Amino acid sequence: MIRLEVIELAEPMSSALEDFKLYAAVPDNTQEQLLLSALRTAMDKVQRVADSALLAGRWRVCADDHPGVVSVYMGGKVVSVTDGEGLPVSFKQRGGRVYLGSDDYVEVEFVTEPVPADYARLLPVVCQYATALYDGQDDKTLNSILLQCL
């Protein structure tokens, strides 16, 4: 099984919140915490579907069933690879793939940074998704918005 865990995820930039408020035509700041929550959720969901980092983050892939290759996501750079006992494992990273010497259990820790071009391309989808969340849209609507990321 392979599992992706969030270790740390940065908050959206204040400019993203302002862009979202403009997109959603929010007239005041009374709902700011709710809007920020919707924006944070939307950014994380869109970055995972698009496989492009929108928020800086630190992640861990735990893999015990792999063929000696583990994928990292969203343009991640590997920080460490350890075995089940926390000992370092040698690896080579090429793009989004981490090549290992064995298929034993590993934990691959990596960091992500937003790419400005991807951020600009995906921000409209984020705003649309966050607005749909804020408006209480159903899963079918939310999923149709995410299709724009592919």
PLM features per residue range, with description:
Residues M1-L150:
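Divalent metal-cofactor coordination and adjacent catalytic microenvironments
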